[in-house]
Regions:
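Non-catalytic substrate-recognition and accessory regions of acyl/acetyltransferase enzymes
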Residues: 1-110, 120-131, 138-216
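A short glycine-leucine-enriched loop at secondary-structure breakpoints
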Residues: 112-114
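P-loop NTPase Walker A phosphate-binding motif
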Residues: 117
């Protein structure tokens, strides 16, 4: 993710919708949330993989009752990282690692924190590790910084995927709080690809606190 591309992502913006049968067939409902007195379902397709937040109440879409999506996450299963092809099992033996390839939120709902809700639900409810992409738009950068600064559920770390080391790259692992590490050490601005190998990692904060306590 650390090559920052100025401007907005070219990802297609919703609306997207799913039939109730499609959700039952392909997705697991991992959480139900209520925001602004409206109910939403967080759904996860582990096989593809992909995740979405959809309205719990069915709506008429082209004459068919469907669950309308308000946010979606495109993901990719990661078995290795970096130019040196380091196995992710070196860092996480008992967790799946999913790389975030794209996140999209309906513009009408962008102030409601749905992207953060998606990240937190996947890590906490499904036990996965989330990894940023190696290229990123400003919106993605802002989202990772927001999660690092404000999330009560997730801890964020900076990983040099080529060297196989976490910041500060001395064998330890420092939590990033959104401001504690200078931006120029994480992101290089396109066309500069100096930090292409740097990725951000989101893990379950409870697990990190448990490991820290056990090592004291």
């Amino acid at each position: 993710m650390p090559v920052l591309i100025r401007g907005d992502s070219n990802m297609i913006v919703m609306p997207l919708s799913y039939s109730a049968s499609a959700i039952a067939r392909s997705f697991e409902v991992i959480e139900e949330i209520t925001i602004a007195e409206k109910r939403y379902l967080i759904i996860f397709d582990k096989k593809t993989p992909r995740a979405s937040i959809v309205k719990a109440e069915l709506e008429d879409v082209g004459g068919e009752l469907r669950h309308v999506a308000v946010a979606m996450l495109e993901l990719n299963n990661q078995k290795s990282i970096g130019d040196n092809v380091i196995s992710v099992e070196r860092f996480w033996e008992d967790s799946s690692v999913l790389q975030v390839e794209g996140v999209c939120v309906d513009r009408r709902y962008q102030e409601l924190g749905f992207a953060t809700q998606l990240y937190e639900a996947l890590v906490i409810k499904c036990g996965v590790i989330l990894m940023s992409d190696n290229t990123q738009y400003e919106g993605g950068k802002a989202l990772w910084q927001k999660i690092a600064k404000s999330s009560n559920a997730l801890s964020v770390f900076i990983l040099d995927s080529d060297a196989g080391l976490f910041f500060p790259y001395d064998g330890t692992k420092a939590i990033y709080d959104g401001i504690s590490i200078p931006e120029e050490k994480i992101w290089s601005v396109h066309p500069d690809v100096e930090h292409f190998g740097i990725v951000l990692i989101a893990e379950d904060k409870r697990r990190i606190e448990t490991l820290t306590f056990s090592n004291e």
